[in-house]
């Protein structure tokens, strides 16, 4: 392998994904293992992580340009590690950069997971060529990343705000962070399963509802995911006025519902703000071209791919 290669890893709530990635966003080698880490087991988790990293480095004789790491959480201003890591609380306050540097002596880039997803989609997927691009990551949690002229928009903790907690239904269902009626509580996995319990009369996991809606063989699942799409269109109508993206990409496990989700999202978005965006596009003199909403082009390794983008494009 003579081309530049980077190693990326994505620490998820249930699974940690590790891969060798080239500058074209292709994953050349991949492995994963269960995250399962508590404060008492942090050392064993880090040992496992470093062993898996070394195993991939050995495949290319250690000839990589650097290591990119991503996780769900806020990164400190010095970019040394998470000061708040929602899916792995044991990582709070850990200087991950120093640990990786001491172990592997390679350049290290840390990025929060929504910006990793957004950078991957912007660089290699449906966001290519757009000046202002938004990516809505839809899973257990919900968050949006924004790219402005090639750079991720970063506020507190390296994120473009905590957009998943925008209130859609005041006094509505409570999310895991205590917000009442926020987008995450309505659109995320908990919202899907809550609707499932109401409409099926018994518990059904979100992944099954999503799969059935995509395959088109379950009217209840289709109805649930259509409602999720309507909520999504409502959220994006508000966010689009703040960030004025030219394209919005839906990514994550919930977006795998496909056409039923996308159609309902576009329907609600168009009904609420379609005329606004067309009007501004018409009179902007080419500065703004309007907005369209699409499904992600990338698969479930988006996080680790996005973790290394800045190594190839510093």
What is each of the regions a protein language model found here?
Residues 113, 139, 307:
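Active-site glycine-centered loops adjacent to acidic/histidine catalytic or metal-binding residues
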Residues 128-186:
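Glycine-rich phosphate-binding loop of actin/hexokinase-like ATP-binding domains
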Residues 80-93:
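A charged helix-plus-loop insertion that forms the helical arch/lid used to bind
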Residues 1-65, 75-81, 98, 102-106, ...:
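ATP-binding/phosphotransfer module of carbohydrate and carboxylate kinases, centering on a glycine-rich
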Residues 14-15, 116, 140-143:
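Conserved A3 ("GATE") glycine/threonine-rich loop of ANL adenylate-forming enzymes
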Residues 108-112:
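General beta-strand structural signal in soluble alpha/beta enzymes
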């Amino acid at each position: 392998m003579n081309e530049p290669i980077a190693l990326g890893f994505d620490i998820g709530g249930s699974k940690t994904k590790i891969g060798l990635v080239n500058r074209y966003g292709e994953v050349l080698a991949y492995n994963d293992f269960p995250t399962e880490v508590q404060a008492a087991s942090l050392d064993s988790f880090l040992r496992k992580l470093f062993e898996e990293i070394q195993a991939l480095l050995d495949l290319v004789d250690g000839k990589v340009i650097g290591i990119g790491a991503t996780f769900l959480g806020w990164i400190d201003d010095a970019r040394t590690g998470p000061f708040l890591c929602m899916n792995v609380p044991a990582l709070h306050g850990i200087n991950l950069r120093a640990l990786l540097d001491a172990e592997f002596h390679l350049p290290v880039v840390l990025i929060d997971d929504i910006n990793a997803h957004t950078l991957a989609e912007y660089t290699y997927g449906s966001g290519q060529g757009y000046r202002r691009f938004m990516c809505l990551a839809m899973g257990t949690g919900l968050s949006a990343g924004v790219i402005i002229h090639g750079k991720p928009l970063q506020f507190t903790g390296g994120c473009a705000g905590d957009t998943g907690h925008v209130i859609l239904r005041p006094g509505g269902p409570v999310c895991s962070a205590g917000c009442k009626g926020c987008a995450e509580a309505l659109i995320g996995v908990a919202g899907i399963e809550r609707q499932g319990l109401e409409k099926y009369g018994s518990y059904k996991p979100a992944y099954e509802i999503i799969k059935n809606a995509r395959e088109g063989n379950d009217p209840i699942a289709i109805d649930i995911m259509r409602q999720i799409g309507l909520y999504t269109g409502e959220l994006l109508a508000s966010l689009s006025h703040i960030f004025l993206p030219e394209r919005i990409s839906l990514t994550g496990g919930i977006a795998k519902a496909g056409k039923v989700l996308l159609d309902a999202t576009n329907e609600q978005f168009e009904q609420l703000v379609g005329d606004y965006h067309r009007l501004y596009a018409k009179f902007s003199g080419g500065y703004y071209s309007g907005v369209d909403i699409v499904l992600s082009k990338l698969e479930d390794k988006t996080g680790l791919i996005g973790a290394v983008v800045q190594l190839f494009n510093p």
